[in-house]
From Swiss-Prot:
Domain Ig-like C2-type as annotated: residue spans: 569-671
PANTHER family, per the entry: SEMAPHORIN, SEMAPHORIN-3G
Subcellular location: Secreted
Identification of the protein by name: Semaphorin-3G
């Protein structure tokens, strides 16, 4: 078996052992708090903007915190929303395709509804008063400048004289992945620039310099799927700034076979790249790329790789620290589907680009480090003070020797891969019912340290709020899912996510619309100190009276209680109710069950992460015993199910939860078992009168009462008795029963006995709220 197959089997085996265990606790991978779409709206935690037509068909989103605006690109339109209000006064600019473009798109065989329109896909800041917007233009990409005004103004209109071709800036298709960033008046874009989507390139355009693009050599880009582009400075010398592209590509198998594999890359080009003078004219002369590795170590050195790059978030640090790259990956294996989050230090990426180049003698050979002499200036290095040395005036890439450019063209790949921090993912998800598409991160200062809160957007319209606790070294981090927030009413893939640390808001976009979501709402965790502490949310702390937002400036106050790493309320919440006190505070609720039938005792803990335990106190016993489950008694997620109730099951059941050593009582239920002999006494059998023969034809069969199906499903053993009782109740107060019951004289007799049935019902504490003249549902329908 191949090493990768061994790794997959090892990972699946571990997941099956973990997920299939009969332990009482689902673990911290289950969200502690689940909030539905309605819950978020009622708590005033989210605000939704769906556009004037009820659906935006969102394609692009740009968060401008300088202007306090959120700009959206949709179907034939752009929108501007103010951040200081919940979308009360949006601005809209209609931007349909130019005359004739839609018709030409249809003639070329494209779909008139989903493709032959202007899908606005690029929104980039152009200057202090304008945005650069580009759309697909019905498969004829178009760009224009959008006036947005100065800070404090809420204006939005398109400059008609600025409309120009967007080829090389925006994809032709509305669904094809791409990435772009705007730097010093120029747009850098990674995309497929042709109508058929086959010509992949990295393109620079829009400024005073000539346009620059990738070489057409297939060794540079193999069917890339661009995810992100960003300018990342390396030092104080701006001439050394580079634009980094994060993407996946499909390459030939490294073993020289005919198969292809998917790998993730980080590539870069210099901002001041001007191409070559004789070689690589108007082409990138500083392009390099390296592999991004995100894998789970397995036995024997085998690794399970997550090779498909889904999204990237740059966590900019405070002064003196290295930038961190959070990357979301997925598997491309047909065996199982999984997702992982890996974190890379930017210093490690720089080290790889300063390392050896990858080289092989031919397509059938293995890759190895280049062992020859590397020309000067080193290929991939930007023209700067380092290269403009006395006697070697390399002030521009056009001054680079031809051998440098030829080497750069032949060796764009680095030999060393970029490995994540601690050598493994900080988060692995392989048991999700949904897929993960988007990631943003917020670094939060808590009482016991600093934590990175990860927000993950799914394909079902929900957001997962997660923290990963690293124990140190290469140990596997502990994953804690804090919340699962259903942002949109209808399940829809989340395609855009932006975070505003200043406003403590998350902006979530989908094809339907955009939502403004608070990063935290601490009071939803509960009203007790223990519940606030067990939540382990870095945003929240107990202030002595309630669970509120933690502010580091106030963190030194004595009564601020917070424990993210351990979540131990016993240490943080002294004087709170213990288990024995909690049992006495929860009143017991009476529950009745019938012998030999099924009965369900419901227990819904506040936290799905807690371990649930059932205790039974039988009459006469000194203390409670733990309920033992078997084929007859089942422990489900929502409570305790008795498939066949016994008279010995009577007693007081206490449902308790245990989480991080803290136990609390959820519910107490006093189960009273009604034995079968008692039912026989309550409903004595009566002789059945002879039925008159049918008048010709087939004998008519009375319709079956609706309640009989339910009683048969739960295995009720005294169906004739209940049937008899129900007929008496329905016939009470009427002069004639329905045709599906007995004769009129029989109904009069039943009316006389119906009061006895009511008295019996009172003794059984049954709750009958039906009206006096209620009839079976089947009779009402006739």
């Amino acid at each position: 078996m191949a090493p990768s197959a061994w790794a997959i089997c090892w990972l699946l085996g571990g997941l099956l052992l973990h997920g299939g265990s009969s332990g009482p606790s689902p673990g911290p991978s289950v969200p502690r708090l689940r909030l539905s779409y309605r819950d978020l709206l009622s708590a005033n935690r989210s605000a939704i903007f769906l556009g004037p037509q009820g659906s935006l068909n969102l394609q692009a989103m740009y968060l401008d915190e300088y202007r306090d605006r959120l700009f959206l690109g949709g179907l034939d339109a752009l929108y501007s929303l103010r951040l200081d209000q919940a979308w009360p006064d949006p601005r809209e600019v209609l931007w349909p395709p130019q005359p004739g473009q839609r018709e030409e798109c249809v003639r070329k065989g494209r779909d008139p509804l989903t493709e032959c329109a202007n899908f606005v896909r690029v929104l980039q800041p152009h200057n202090r008063t304008h945005l650069l917007a580009c759309g697909t233009g019905a498969f004829q990409p178009t760009c224009a400048l959008i006036t947005v005004g100065h800070r404090g103004e809420h204006v939005l209109h398109l400059e008609p004289g600025s409309v120009e071709s967007g080829r090389g800036r925006c994809p032709h298709e509305p669904s094809r992945p791409f990435a772009s960033t705007f730097i010093d008046g120029e747009l850098y874009t990674g995309l497929t620039a042709d109508f058929l989507g086959r010509e992949a390139m990295i393109f620079r355009s829009g400024g005073p310099r000539p346009a620059l693009r990738s070489d057409s050599d297939q060794s540079l880009l193999h069917d890339p799927r661009f995810v992100m582009a960003a300018r990342i400075p390396e030092n104080s010398d701006q001439d050394n700034d580079k634009v980094y592209f994060f993407f996946s590509e499909t390459v030939p198998s490294p073993d020289g076979g005919s198969n292809h594999v998917t790998v993730s890359r980080v590539g870069r080009v210099c901002v001041n790249d001007a191409g070559g003078q004789r070689v690589l004219v108007n082409k990138w002369s500083t392009f390099l790329k390296a592999r991004l590795v995100c894998s789970v170590p397995g036995p024997g050195g085998a690794e399970t790789h997550f090779d498909q790059l889904e999204d990237v978030f740059l966590l900019w640090p405070k002064a003196g620290k290295s930038l961190e790259v959070y990357a979301l990956f997925s598997t491309v294996s047909a065996v199982f589907q999984g997702f992982a989050v890996c974190v890379y230090h930017m210093a490690d990426i720089w080290e790889v680009f300063n390392g050896p180049f990858a080289h092989r003698d031919g397509p059938q050979h293995q890759w190895g480090p280049y062992g020859g002499k590397v020309p000067f200036p080193r290929p991939g290095v930007c023209p700067s003070k380092m290269t403009a040395q006395p006697g070697r005036p390399f002030g521009s890439t056009k001054d680079y020797p031809d051998e440098v450019l030829q080497f750069a063209r032949a060796h764009p790949l680095m030999f060393w891969p970029v490995r994540p921090r601690h050598g493994r993912p900080v988060l692995v998800k392989t048991h999700l019912a949904q897929q993960l598409h988007q990631i943003v991160v917020d670094r939060v200062e808590a009482e016991d340290g600093t934590y990175d809160v990860i927000f993950l957007g799914t394909d079902s319209g929900s957001v997962l709020k997660v923290i990963a606790l690293q124990a140190g070294g290469s140990a596997e981090p502990e994953e804690v899912v804090l919340e699962e927030l259903q942002v949109f009413k209808v399940p829809t893939p989340i395609t855009e996510m932006e975070i505003s640390v200043k406003r403590q808001m998350l902006y979530v976009g989908s094809r339907l619309g955009v939502a403004q979501l608070r990063l935290h709402q601490c009071e939803t965790y509960g009203t007790a100190c223990a519940e606030c502490c067990l939540a382990r949310d870095p945003y929240c702390a107990w202030d002595g009276a309630s669970c509120t937002h933690y502010r580091p400036s106030l963190g030194k106050r004595r009564f601020r209680r917070q424990d993210i790493r351990h979540g131990n309320p016993a240490l943080q919440c002294l004087g709170q109710s213990q288990e024995e006190e909690a049992v006495g505070l929860v009143a017991a609720t009476m529950v009745y069950g019938t012998e030999h039938n099924s009965t369900f005792l419901e227990c819904l803990p506040k936290s799905p992460q807690a371990a649930v335990r059932w205790l039974l106190q039988r009459p006469g016993d000194e203390g409670p015993d733990q309920v033992k489950t078997d084929e007859r008694v089942l422990h489900t997620e929502r409570g305790l199910l008795f498939r066949r109730l016994s008279r010995f099951d009577a007693g007081t059941y206490t449902c308790t939860t245990l989480e991080h050593g803290f136990s609390q009582t959820v519910v107490r239920l006093a189960l009273v078992v009604i034995v079968a002999s008692q039912l026989d006494n309550l409903f004595p059998p009566e002789p059945k009168p002879e039925e008159p023969p049918a008048r010709g034809g087939l004998a008519s069969t009375p319709p079956k009462a609706w309640y009989k199906d339910i009683l048969q499903l739960i295995g009720f053993a005294n169906l004739p008795r209940v049937d008899e009782y129900c007929e008496r109740v329905w016939c009470r107060g009427t002069t004639e029963c329905s045709g599906c019951f007995r004769s009129r004289s029989r109904g009069k007799q039943a009316r006389g006995k119906s009061w006895a049935g009511l008295e019996l019902g009172k003794k059984m504490k049954s709750r009958v709220h039906a009206e006096h003249n209620r009839t079976p549902r089947e009779v009402e329908a006739t």
